[in-house]
Amino acid sequence: LIAGSILAATAPAPVDGQEAEPGPRIAITIDDLPWNGPSPAEGRETATGRLLEALTARGVVATGFVRCAGIAPDASLLRLWVDYGMPLGNHSESHRDLNSAPLDVWLEDVRTCDARLRDVIDGPVRHFRYPMLHQGPTPERREAALEVLRELNYEIAHVSVDNSDFMLSRPYEAAVGAGDAVEARRIGRLLIDHIIAAVRHAQAVARRKVGRDVDHILLLHATLLVSDQIGALLDALAAEGFRFVPLEEALKDPVYRAPDGYTGRSGLSWLYRMEPASPEDANWDDAEAARIRKALHQ
């Protein structure tokens, strides 16, 4: 049996023996904390607070992944996340690329961030996300990195819904900075339409490879665009029938324990990596990125 046929028969178990509610589920994760991009006019703390308020108002527990080199100038932003009850994960100290950085330097980046995050949250850090989703270009390098991550007791925060939100972030910031509300609204709408399209694509890939809906994990970035649009995006996902679950709950889905079938330099969705690997599914991502580039220049 291939991994997909094994996993098809195994959906996540209901919590505490209760009957599971119908409908697909999704976890929200946000990378590059404390903040990615220039400070908005209102300040990063206000923008971060707006993001966290929108999540909390909808009962969403999102996990934020921290680039720890940014902690010193923006420690107050991480305290906001902790105060709102949002878990924090390790995204490394300097966002080094496992494809090209010396392995010892990359691992030290991970260990340094682990120590700094433990001080912030006053406890262990549970989840790690690879910078750029690069997990190692060779089996040897991938396994060497995994060995240290296991020693640190990390669970890998896989992504099932990757997307190009970062392509829209700087044009959005430029529109806001120029006072162009019409263009800012247009880019905000582009973001929501793009994420919904990416989610639908991920659902189709999961159903084809696993034979069922899976608990999805969405990757976003800590930007002004996401801060401003997260409420509308969550509402759009809810309109698609999604219920929101914490990352740790989504990762209980057996799909995230499937064998990794991909070795290479690309940063891929877990649905593309899992056996049988289907990196050709990333052609959709490339076409969607091209559509966004075209839309930005209209």
Name the predicted role of every residue range.
Residues 1-9:
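Bacterial N-terminal signal peptides
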Residues 40-41, 96-120, 138-152, 160-212, ...:
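Alpha-helical scaffold elements lining the catalytic groove of polysaccharide deacetylases
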Residues 84-88, 150-155:
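Glycine-enriched alpha-helix->loop->beta-strand junction motifs that scaffold or abut catalytic
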